[in-house]
């Protein structure tokens, strides 16, 4: 083997190459050290790493090429080796998790704000960013709503969903958008009694398996253990009329199972021969239809839609259903969410609860009304204070205290005019988030419905029939009821009442604060104010 290690810049002489005269060609040179005067010291020589020996070059050209049986183990020098398993299993971040994306979010008044988020940002993270920017109170009810105005569809994003992934599935150039608003019904299935969301007649296990277990225990097992019963009931399904080209509505008996959504072609039969498959739960999303009568001709106001994920635009492929009432629709929507996400929904609820408790423990208490559920009426007229237990006495004490406070405030801050106190008391409600000004009855019902038909959601608006009156719109049992508030004047003082003057309040703020603690003539307490937040 010959190694040519001589650099080009070194000179060689014939004496260095030829052997000494008289020495046989086969004889190697003597090992004795040369004389000191003829010593030649070696120099370090650079050897390229890609240099091949002549024998290797010859073998490489003479042997046939053999395919590599493990191509996944080899990679170009400029790339890192490919490791098996997903990035989540290895504890590493996804390759594009640091990629920044722009997400546009709209408020209920139509204002838009662009937010720069990471590619893996969840809906909960985006809501927290918007709450901080809007200087709003942070709670578990904030959410993002995926809205498709062209299709009249909308749904609330779950807290764990990726906002960027949802946005990338939208059609290019469409009018789809995210809306930032409160959704009080998001976790109501873990708060309210089970029979309010899942009626006994709609849970198949209660009717088919007489095991002795109560309906409430069955629903608790459904929510806690992840055992999925069958949801069933009559729904109207939109179909095409033969030869007419019109969309007709027909009533079918439907079943929601873990495997998908079905309807029976023969009455209430559950025979597999009579079941027609509609949609896969894991490959679809359920939406609320907002303008069903106008766009789809829905016979009632309680429509919902099952939209396959692969469907990007157009009405073709949408499965439009119509229920008889709001309770039935809420049951189908809640069951669909539970079947699709399972225990992840309960984890989201627990995380939201822990975040709320942590913020209330670490930070300052949120700004709220003077009235609070922890306050009680006290009487300090004697030598020692006592708790007022009589409701009528407590009401009179609260009214007297509120009037005294307002007299002090008006005397200190207002101008010395006789009607200044009256004007301040009459306009104090305009600064409250629950006051929506002059909106119609239908608009108030729409706003409350968008933020969740939960008991205690309310707003106050100006009356359109009575120029001097107001209306309290309140949700109870998934229905919005309206209560007229009329003003009255007694001895130069203005009062407001909902019961023909039997219970009078100096302003609307006092009326709302009182009914947050006492039902009065209302069917439930005022729990959640329907408010709009500007981004």
From Swiss-Prot:
Domain of life per record? Eukaryota
Outline the extent of the SH2 domain.
434-530
The record ties this protein, via PROSITE patterns, to: PH_DOMAIN, RA, SH2
Q: Where is this site: Important for lipid binding and for stimulation of cell migration?
A: 238
Q: Where is the composition biased (Pro residues)?
A: 21-37
Q: Name one GO cellular component term.
A: cytosol
Q: Where is this site: Important for dimerization and for HRAS activation?
A: 514
Residues annotated as coiled-coil are: none
Positions of post-translational Phosphotyrosine modification: 187, 341
The chain positions of domain PH read 228-341
Family matches, as CDD domains: PH_APBB1IP, RA_GRB7, SH2_Grb7
The record's subcellular location field reads: Cytoplasm; Cell projection; Cell junction, Focal adhesion; Cell membrane
What terms describe the molecular function in GO for this protein? Answer: identical protein binding; phosphatidylinositol binding; protein kinase binding; RNA binding
GO biological process terms held by the UniProt record: negative regulation of translation; positive regulation of cell migration; signal transduction; stress granule assembly
PTM comment, free text:
Phosphorylated on serine and threonine residues in response to activation of receptor kinases. Phosphorylated on tyrosine residues by TEK/TIE2. Phosphorylated on tyrosine residues by PTK2/FAK1, and possibly also other kinases. Phosphorylation is enhanced by activation of receptor kinases by a cognate ligand. Tyrosine phosphorylation is essential for activation of down-stream protein kinases. Phosphorylation decreases affinity for target mRNA molecules.
Phosphoserine found at: 364
Q: Where is this region: Disordered?
A: 1-89
Query: What is this entry's stated membrane topology?
Result: Peripheral membrane protein
Q: Give the multimer and partner information.
A: Homodimer. Interacts (via SH2 domain) with EGFR, ERBB2, ERBB3 (when phosphorylated), ERBB4 (when phosphorylated), EPHB1, INSR, FGFR1, PDGFRA (tyrosine phosphorylated) and PDGFRB (tyrosine phosphorylated). Interacts with SHC1. Interacts with RND1. Interacts (when tyrosine phosphorylated) with FHL2 and HAX1. Interacts (via SH2 domain) with RET and PTK2/FAK1. Interacts (when not phosphorylated) with ELAVL1. In stressed cells, but not in normal cells, part of a complex that contains at least GRB7, PTK2/FAK1, STAU1, ELAVL1 and TIA1. Interacts (via SH2 domain) with KIT (phosphorylated).
Q: Which PANTHER family match?
A: GROWTH FACTOR RECEPTOR-BOUND PROTEIN, GROWTH FACTOR RECEPTOR-BOUND PROTEIN 7
Q: What does this protein do?
A: Adapter protein that interacts with the cytoplasmic domain of numerous receptor kinases and modulates down-stream signaling. Promotes activation of down-stream protein kinases, including STAT3, AKT1, MAPK1 and/or MAPK3. Promotes activation of HRAS. Plays a role in signal transduction in response to EGF. Plays a role in the regulation of cell proliferation and cell migration. Plays a role in the assembly and stability of RNA stress granules. Binds to the 5'UTR of target mRNA molecules and represses translation of target mRNA species, when not phosphorylated.
Q: What is known of its domains?
A: The PH domain mediates interaction with membranes containing phosphoinositides.
From the Swiss-Prot or TrEMBL record, give the protein name. Answer: Growth factor receptor-bound protein 7
Supply the source organism for this entry. Answer: Rattus norvegicus
């Amino acid at each position: 083997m010959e190694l040519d290690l001589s650099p080009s810049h070194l000179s060689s002489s014939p004496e260095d190459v030829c052997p000494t005269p008289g020495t046989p060609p086969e004889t190697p040179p003597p090992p004795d050290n040369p004389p000191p005067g003829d010593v030649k010291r070696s120099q370090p020589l650079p050897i390229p790493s890609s240099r091949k020996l002549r024998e290797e070059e010859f073998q490489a050209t003479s042997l046939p090429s053999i395919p590599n049986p493990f191509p996944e183990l080899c990679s170009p020098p400029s790339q890192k080796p490919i490791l098996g398993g997903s990035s989540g299993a290895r504890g590493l971040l996804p390759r594009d998790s640091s990629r920044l994306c722009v997400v546009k979010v709209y408020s209920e008044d139509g204002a838009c704000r662009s937010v720069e988020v990471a590619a893996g940002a969840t809906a909960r993270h985006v809501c927290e960013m918007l709450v901080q920017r809007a200087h709003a109170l942070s709670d578990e009810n904030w959410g993002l709503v995926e809205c498709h105005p062209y299709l009249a569809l909308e749904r609330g994003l779950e807290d764990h969903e990726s906002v960027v992934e949802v946005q990338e599935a939208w059609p290019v150039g469409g009018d789809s958008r995210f809306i930032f608003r409160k959704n009080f019904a998001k976790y109501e299935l873990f708060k309210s009694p089970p029979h309010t969301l899942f009626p006994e007649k709609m849970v198949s296990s209660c009717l088919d398996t007489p095991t002795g277990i109560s309906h409430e225990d069955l629903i608790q097992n459904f929510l806690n253990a992840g055992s999925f019963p069958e949801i069933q009931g009559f729904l109207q399904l939109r179909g095409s009329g033969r030869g007419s080209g019109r969309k007709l509505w027909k009533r079918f008996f439907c079943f929601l199972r873990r495997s998908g959504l079905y309807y029976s072609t023969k009455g209430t039969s559950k025979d597999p021969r009579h079941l027609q498959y509609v949609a896969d739960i894991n490959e679809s999303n359920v939406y609320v239809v907002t303008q069903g009568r106008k766009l789809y001709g829905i016979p009632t106001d309680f429509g919902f839609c099952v939209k396959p994920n692969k469907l990007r635009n157009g009405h073709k492929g949408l499965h439009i259903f119509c229920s008889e009432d709001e309770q039935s629709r809420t049951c189908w929507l809640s069951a669909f969410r539970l079947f699709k996400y399972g225990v992840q929904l309960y984890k989201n609820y627990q995380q939201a609860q822990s975040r709320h408790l942590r913020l209330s423990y670490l930070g300052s208490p949120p700004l709220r009304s003077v009235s609070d559920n922890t306050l009680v009426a006290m009487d300090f007229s004697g030598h020692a204070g006592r708790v007022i237990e009589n409701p009528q006495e407590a009401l009179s004490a609260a009214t007297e205290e509120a009037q005294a406070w307002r007299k002090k405030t008006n005397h200190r801050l207002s101008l010395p005019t006789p009607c200044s106190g009256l004007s301040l008391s009459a306009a104090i409600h305009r600064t409250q988030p629950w006051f929506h000004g002059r909106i119609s009855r239908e608009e108030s019902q729409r706003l409350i419905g968008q933020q969740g038909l939960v008991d205690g959601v309310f707003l106050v608006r100006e009356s359109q029939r009575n120029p001097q009156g107001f209306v309290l719109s309140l949700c109870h049992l998934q229905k919005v009821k309206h209560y007229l508030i009329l003003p009255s004047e007694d001895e130069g003082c203005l009062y407001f009442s909902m019961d023909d003057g039997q219970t009078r309040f100096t302003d609307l703020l006092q009326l709302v604060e009182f009914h947050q603690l006492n039902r009065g003539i209302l069917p439930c307490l005022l729990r959640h104010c329907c408010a709009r937040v500007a981004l």
